[in-house]
């Protein structure tokens, strides 16, 4: 949680910590720099170093694909995923985008009983077969024409964007 500055990991290592957890929200380049720092550190110490991964509030489809790709690039195969607990799957996305995810990535997403796509977690795992077959994002470009423009100068509208009306 404390990996907020570019020098956080070197400071933690100097204090005796053994690693860091990557979060895409902290920056992908920072994650690569941390991985390089840990690789160098491991060459100069007897005790192992650790690079883990976590996602607190990652909402698919686009951000999830980026996060999964980054974790794979860093060699992190076990990721703490919490984002799917805080949001109603892809319910905030246009119906066309939801349908596209269920049609083209039915291994990664499943239909929630209320109809919207949600992560299809099976035995703690995500099936990435369709994602790996579409390495540059969703198999089908998402139709975003029905997204509502948000007035970022109005904090109330910005904060409530994507939240259910009820």
Model-assigned labels for residue ranges:
Residues 3-127:
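Shared catalytic-loop signature of beta/alpha-barrel
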Residues 112-166:
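Extended hydrophobic packing segments that form well-structured cores
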């Amino acid at each position: 949680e404390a990996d907020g500055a570019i020098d956080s990991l070197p400071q933690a290592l100097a204090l005796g910590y053994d690693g860091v957890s990557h979060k895409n929200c902290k920056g992908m380049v920072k994650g690569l720099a941390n991985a390089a720092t840990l690789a160098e550190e491991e060459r100069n110490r007897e005790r192992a170093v650790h690079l883990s991964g976590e996602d607190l509030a990652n909402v698919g489809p686009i951000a999830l694909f980026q996060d999964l790709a980054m974790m794979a690039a860093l060699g992190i195969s076990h990721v703490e995923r919490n984002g799917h607990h805080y949001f109603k799957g892809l319910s905030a996305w246009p119906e066309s985008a939801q349908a596209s995810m269920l049609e083209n990535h039915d291994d990664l997403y499943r239909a929630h009983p209320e109809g919207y796509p949600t992560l299809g977690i099976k035995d703690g795992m995500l099936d990435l077969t369709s994602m790996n077959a579409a390495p540059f994002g969703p198999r089908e470009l998402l139709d975003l024409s029905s997204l509502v423009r948000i007035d970022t100068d109005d904090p109330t509208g910005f904060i409530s964007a994507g939240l259910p009306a009820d």
